[in-house]
Amino acid sequence: MNMSLETRINDLETRLAFQDDTIQALNDVLVAQQRVVERLQMQLEALAKRQEELIEEFGSVDDDGAPPPHY
């Protein structure tokens, strides 16, 4: 079956429009995910800083494998 040139062009234009919509949707998701990643990185940095502060304040925990005294 030979499709007419006009039909083929219309089909390609339709596919292109759907591809443009898909690319935009994927880009929107990517931007949202990047924001989440950046927020998580900031939270991780804050937690690491807080951990360092606690270690400086209370010292490191020495875990010799012995159960705590209440056992």
UniProtKB/Swiss-Prot annotation:
Signal peptide positions (record): none
One Pfam family of this chain: SlyX
InterPro entries: SlyX
Name of the protein described by the UniProt record: Protein SlyX homolog
Superkingdom to which the source organism belongs: Bacteria
Source organism: Azotobacter vinelandii (strain DJ / ATCC BAA-1303)
Family membership: Belongs to the SlyX family.
